[in-house]
Amino acid sequence: MYLGHIREVVTFLTGQYPGLRLLLWDDMLRKIPAQVIRESGITQHAAPVLWFYTPDLDTEQIGKIITKYAESGFSTVWFASAFKGTTGPAQMWTPLNHHLKNHLSWLKVIQAMAKFPTIQYQGIVLTGWQRYDHYSVLCELLPVGIPSLALCLQTLVNGGFTDTTKKRILELLGFQNIHLEQSTCEGTGSFPGSEIYHMVERVNVQLKEKALKVLEEESAIEGWFSRYHRRHRFGNPRNLESFGSKLIKTFEDWESFLQGFRTRLEAVFFPDTVEEWLEENVNVQLEPLRELVHDYREVIQLNGRPKSR
């Protein structure tokens, strides 16, 4: 059924556009015997795109797949790597070393293609997933993945990751240094979207930590402004004031930051994308803090009124 569908599509498109060669992501092809693929007639006008996104590729397994495609009658093969998006459906921050290793592994495969004389390597597609499918949440935003894209592209162009490669990457991005294991970059950056890159970094590194620190490490909140106190709208003003200024400052600092962050996002993304990303990555952390501040402001005005029923 699959090959029949592909044959119909190939026949139609090559009839409309003579000389066109179609690229087929090879998921479905891997389980189909070489002879069946050959007899389908699709190999004359199509090429498989062999994709793996893990850091350490099984080159022996990939070699077997390439051999099978050569036996199937394909004259060319493409590969597909990833510079972002494949490390988790809700990933916020791109792990640089993971994607660098993926490309270094693909370089080994590319450099070994002489072992397959009947099938020619055509190129590699660097994928940058935005979602895992139409129903999943957003993974890394493109500005967050641009340093990884530069890293992976330059590694492919230069045939490896060397000091010279690193220097070129830093020049392109406008950074002073790049830390692969920590997935961080030093400097302001000069690439389009660098402001968003740094703002997302702040959300990723600081928001959850700062919000939790206020909510969980402040014993006065636990002792004198628990959920029970908040539900019944009472509290001792003296105890509330011991943490109130810190609570409000933390909240207002983040609210001020997020106003500017939203403006930056809206200059690049559609409104629904902005709303979704903030809902998934910011509000989930900030909402408990926002609710606590709201309750604090209401209860402190009651000036020690006894517990409501």
Identify the role of each PLM range.
Residues 3-309:
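Substrate-binding groove of N-acetylhexosamine-processing glycoside hydrolases
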